[in-house]
């Protein structure tokens, strides 16, 4: 029974880590589907749109520099939770925005989230899984990262088809309104996996290696 329980927990851990990879992929790919409609309805110039696109990369570069230090300071699980919360917060900041600054802020938050996830989730997997399972964990993380990019593209494709259908009606005002709704909806769709990642991160145990390093031997043994 103990073996079955441990196996079930490891599957749950892999699921949570996989959701982290999915969010990373969504961070990278989501703007591609939203950009044409954002450009058509936001009134932003080319330079501003370029910054909105690049802000996620800037946020990722910055957070990656400090992710390891933060993971050592506050723990792997807490940093995973915070990274998920940053992603969740970024969605309404972007989707409800009506100006340049909120868009950039939301994209920066997404980038910071992605940078943290890209460091702390593989680190957490390496410290929590057995040597025989680490390759599987890394593979699942990378596979779902790629799936996140593909999923973002599929969502963008769906809305492009819907926009084409509305365009055939010939009502310019309706088309403009739908394009505005489309890019916001593309971001809203990515909210549920972010929320699931946060919930999962709260439910998993802290890394036993981190607990040992903090002198919390009993807690570390319980987490094994």
Model segments located where?
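Transmembrane-helix signature of 12-pass secondary carriers
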Residues: 1-224
């Amino acid at each position: 029974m103990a073996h079955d329980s441990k196996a079930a927990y490891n599957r749950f851990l892999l699921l949570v880590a996989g959701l982290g990879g999915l969010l990373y992929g969504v961070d990278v790919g989501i703007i591609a589907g939203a950009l044409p409609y954002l450009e058509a309805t936001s009134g932003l110039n080319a330079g501003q749109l370029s910054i909105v696109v690049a802000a996620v990369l800037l946020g990722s570069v910055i957070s990656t520099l400090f992710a390891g230090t933060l993971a050592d300071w506050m723990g792997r699980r807490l940093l995973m939770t915070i990274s998920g919360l940053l992603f969740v917060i970024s969605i309404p900041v972007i989707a409800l925005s009506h100006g340049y600054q909120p868009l950039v802020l939301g994209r920066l938050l997404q980038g910071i989230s992605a940078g943290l996830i890209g460091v702390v989730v593989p680190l957490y997997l390496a410290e929590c899984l057995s040597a025989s399972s680490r390759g599987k964990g890394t593979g699942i993380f990378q596979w779902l990262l790629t799936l996140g990019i593909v999923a973002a593209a599929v969502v963008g494709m769906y809305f492009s088809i819907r926009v084409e259908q509305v365009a055939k009606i010939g009502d310019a005002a309706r088309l403009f309104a739908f394009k505005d709704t489309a890019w916001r909806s593309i971001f809203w769709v990515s909210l549920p996996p972010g929320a699931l990642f946060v919930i999962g991160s709260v439910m998993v145990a802290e890394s036993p290696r981190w607990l040992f390093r903090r002198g919390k031997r009993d807690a570390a043994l319980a987490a094994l």
